[in-house]
Amino acid sequence: MTLPTTNLGKTGLTVSRLCLGTMTFGLQTDEETSRHILDTAADGGINFLDTADVYPLGGGLATAGRTEEIVGRWLKGKREHFILATKCVGRVGPAPWDQGASRKHILDAIDASLRRLGTDYIDLYQLHSDDASTPLDETLEALDAVVRAGKVRYIGVSNFLAYRLARALGRAETRNLTKFISIQPCYNLLFREIERELLPLAKEEGLGVISYNPLAGGLLTGKHTLAQGPTSGTRFTLGAAAERYQDRYWRDREFNTVEDLRTVADLAGFSLTTLAVAWVLSNPIITAPIIGASRPEQLTDNLKAAELKLDDSLKQKLDDLTAEYRRGDSLR
């Protein structure tokens, strides 16, 4: 299968219109299954992989880095065929400097990620979140240093407010430092807050947008019910992440909307999963939504979404059904 490709922001880096997220690898998903998922994604045309030094999701310090190790072992012998993105800032050790965006942590973190991933460069190195406790210039200088050292090709951010991103872009330009070329925000039919400020900024600055949670943590698959409660082994029950996911999506309003969306999907002749991912892809500002899986077969409906072009009336219906989700806290 050949997926459509596009450039990542204003760069010359060509990526598939779907990016494979790996945060389930090493806890929710064992290594053998993770390798099957990676094989299925590659066979489906995905050349863009996203991970982070704190993954797997729901783990702790004892498991931090495990996902990168799994991805690195799978990549052996085929690194040149994939665009590899990872992230730093999250806590990976017990010391005070084992987290954040300080110069020390960034320089330590990039070397550790390179070792785990078995590579000598990262295509896209991202700040996993904002670190307001570290001077912005210190962070930008450290990221510029790893780019100039050849360890990183491009830099990006995840979970940033628009005003902080705008400030960072301005400081980098003023000081002639490497600028961020992409953002990784949460975006789906039930979480549209970034349409107000962050996406307009990305469009204005020509940033790539690699959005995560296109299926709202699995809620937009339709497999969950409010009455039965969160299913064991899903993002709504995994470790420290469970509370965040429940706070973001586990409410009457969201479940009612999912039922309305399911009706639309049924009438249109698509699975809710395919329709939800296709809706994200229909936004011209989005470069590639990050799709994840705990089983290889879960990728099937996601891959179909790349071939589905929503007609104007169907897209408008989905927009109207979920218009209220444009209001809220973009970092929930």
Model-based region annotation:
Residues 10, 43, 72-80, 115-118, ...:
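Acidic (Asp/Glu)-rich catalytic clusters
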Residues 130, 134-321:
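Beta/alpha (TIM)-barrel catalytic core signal, keyed to glycine-rich beta->alpha loops juxtaposed to Asp/Glu
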Residues 48-52, 84-87, 121-126, 156-157, ...:
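Short beta-strand segments at enzyme active-site cores
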Residues 22-32, 92-104, 130-134:
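Active-site mouth loops of central-metabolism enzymes
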Residues 114-133:
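Active-site groove signature of glycoside hydrolases
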Residues 30-41, 101-117, 165-169:
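Short, acidic/polar
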Residues 1-82:
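N-terminal binding-site loop/beta-alpha segment at the start of enzyme catalytic domains
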Residues 54-55, 77-101:
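Structural motif corresponding to the early beta-alpha repeats
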